[in-house]
Structure formats: C-alpha cells, structure tokens
C-alpha cells in the first residue's frame, strides 16, 4: 500500500503540536516525514551550537520528542521517514565533526523509537573539490554510518540536492542520479545488506529543470 506523507517542518508548530497532528490526519495523510533538521539547523551546526539539542543524555532528548510520538499515535499517524540534521561533516573541522557524529547517533536512536524505517542524511557539497574528491568524501561519510544504521534498523537515504551561489542554482551532490545509484550500490556492498537508499526530492529536481521521466 502506498502511503501519503507530509513533512513535519512547516506543518506542525511547536506551540500547538496537537493541532498540527490533527490537521495532518484530517487532511488524509497516513504518515509524517519528521524533520529533526528543524531542531538542529545548518547555521547552528556551523556555529558549533549543538549541545542543547542532541548532545544530551538520550532519555532527556526523548522527553522533547515523546509528545510527537504520542500525538502521532493518537491520530493514527506513523513516522515512516525522518530527516537528520545536516551537514554531518564539515571539511577541516574535526572537533565539530566528532560532535555531529554523536548527535547523529542520538538522532538515529530517537528516530528508531518514533518508528522511522528511513532516515535522510543529506550528502555534502564541496565547492572547491573535484567531482571524484567530493564522491570519495561523501562515501567515507556514509560508510561511517553503517554500524548505527544496523543498530537502529534504519535505511539511510541520500537525497538530490541543489546549491545556490550569486543568485544562481546549481546541481548539488546527489543530483546526478547515475552517480548516486553507483554510490548506493557501493555502500550496500560494503554494508553486506541494503542499508542505503534514496529520497527523490521532486521539488529540488524541478528547481534544476530535471527531466522527471529520465
């Protein structure tokens, strides 16, 4: 059975959680793509401001998200997929990257408790790197997620991204579908099972003028 889903970001307000989940259910949706990335946004990560969100004891973090799980259950909704905070890795910032790995593992743990089967981990776009260097950087990043993906029974999904510079949009990592398929195949081979998949963002593809059929 196909399920109709909507992202939590923009649909559920923190000051009135129940209204958000009720309206989603009344609109006919079956599930919610939960945006952990709205609780730990990119600018917060780059400013190394992550301790108050996902770098706490897991039970303390769970208290923040438990109301979401309870209200979703009340209205017959599930969290089939989640979006993890990003970027997971930033070149040249090893200390920040270590914190983000721990924050990501905690995020995976909470996603598992909420019933997610898929979690989107955005690839990293490197402006000043050659295409093969960017590919290798992302492959190494995703390989580091294998153990936690297995532990929390999550399929890690890449996503097709766009990037912006000087008011122009460009293809980001993941937008070359053939390249993404090759990367996913290599990651699954390394994992020994299907732990990696793809979240196709039609909006991102439309912004870049992609041919949907192709």
Report the location of each language-model feature.
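Short, amphipathic alpha-helical segments
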Residues: 94, 98-101, 132-139, 171-178
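N-terminal pre-domain/capping segments
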Residues: 1-117, 150, 185, 189, ...
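Hydrophobic alpha-helical segments and helix pairs
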Residues: 107-143, 149
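A short acidic, helix-capping loop that chelates divalent metal ions and anchors anionic groups
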Residues: 42-44, 88-94, 127-131, 164-170
């Amino acid at each position: 059975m196909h399920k109709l889903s909507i992202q939590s970001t923009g649909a559920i307000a923190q000051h009135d959680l129940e209204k958000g989940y009720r309206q989603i259910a009344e609109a006919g949706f079956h599930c919610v793509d939960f945006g952990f990335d709205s609780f730990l946004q990119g600018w917060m990560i780059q400013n190394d401001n992550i301790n108050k969100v996902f770098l706490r004891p897991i039970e303390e973090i769970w208290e923040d998200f438990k109301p979401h799980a309870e209200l979703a259950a009340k209205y017959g909704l599930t969290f089939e997929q989640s979006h993890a905070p990003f970027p997971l890795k930033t070149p040249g910032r090893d200390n920040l990257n270590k914190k983000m790995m721990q924050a990501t593992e905690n995020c995976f743990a909470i996603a598992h408790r909420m019933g997610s089967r898929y979690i989107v981990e955005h690839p990293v776009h490197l402006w000043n790197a050659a295409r093969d260097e960017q590919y290798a950087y992302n492959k190494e990043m995703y390989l580091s997620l294998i153990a936690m993906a297995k532990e929390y029974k999550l399929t890690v999904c890449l996503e097709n991204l766009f990037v912006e510079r000087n008011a122009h949009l460009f293809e980001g990592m993941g937008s070359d579908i053939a390249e993404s398929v090759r990367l996913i195949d290599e990651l699954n081979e390394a994992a020994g099972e299907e732990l990696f998949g793809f979240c196709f963002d039609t909006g991102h593809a439309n912004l870049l003028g992609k041919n949907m059929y192709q």
